[in-house]
Amino acid sequence: QHWSTWLHDAVRKCAEYEMMVDIHDEYRPTGFSRTYPNLLTQEGIHGNEQVPNADHNTMLPFTRFTIGAGDYTPGYTRKDLQTTFAHRLALPVIYYSPAQFLFWNEKLTDEHKRPELDFWKNIPTVWQDTKFLLGEIGEYAVVARRSGTTWYVGGITNTNARCLQLDCSFLSSDKKYIATIYTDDVEVPGKIKITTRKITLKTKLSFMLQRS
């Protein structure tokens, strides 16, 4: 009670000085950001710092993220992470947070070795539309979010591999799209395969998600 009051006072003070806030550790959303939108996000989550597995990650969209934005402290190249690279790349779409920070664990000069990081550079953090397309708690989740006329779709599975079919009927009927698709490269473990294809709202895409 005491420290929650202290935090709320701090958020108010930061608002006076037009400073944004990202609260870490145990604090969870209370709706306070509705009054003070400078409170962009908060941790209050068992995130990448604790190195959770994919079973845990597929529970979060149905539990923690139903009450507000969450800073999952996403990592990407840490050697101890228990998920695939495509799983990690999908999280900023599935997990809502107006402030997204990628915890870098390699030299910045190695960035050219990871061309998929362009996805991280360009992904929005706020959205005009959100659709939960597929999911089962603790099993898998597929979320689509729109910024402007561009859609982003993220899909993850738990520690079991599975095939999922994406129905693209959420797309606009009067548009044709070019989809850039990021998947785990089954021929080169630890790498991301990037492909492009034309799609419309009538397209159905099948994906084989690797375990974790």
Question: Where in this protein do the model-derived segments appear?
Answer:
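Aromatic- and carboxylate-enriched substrate-binding clefts and catalytic-loop regions
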Residues: 1-82
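Acidic/polar loop patches that form or flank catalytic/metal-binding clefts of enzymes
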Residues: 19-25, 98-109, 117, 127-131, ...
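Conserved, mostly hydrophobic/aromatic
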Residues: 21, 94, 153, 212
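Charge-patterned, long linear interaction tracts outside catalytic cores
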Residues: 72-111
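Glycan-recognition and catalytic regions of carbohydrate-active enzymes
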Residues: 107-152, 185-191
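Carbohydrate-binding surface patches
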Residues: 137-173
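Solvent-exposed beta-hairpin/edge-strand motifs
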Residues: 170-184
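C-terminal beta-strand-rich structural cap/linker in extracellular carbohydrate-active enzymes
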Residues: 196-212
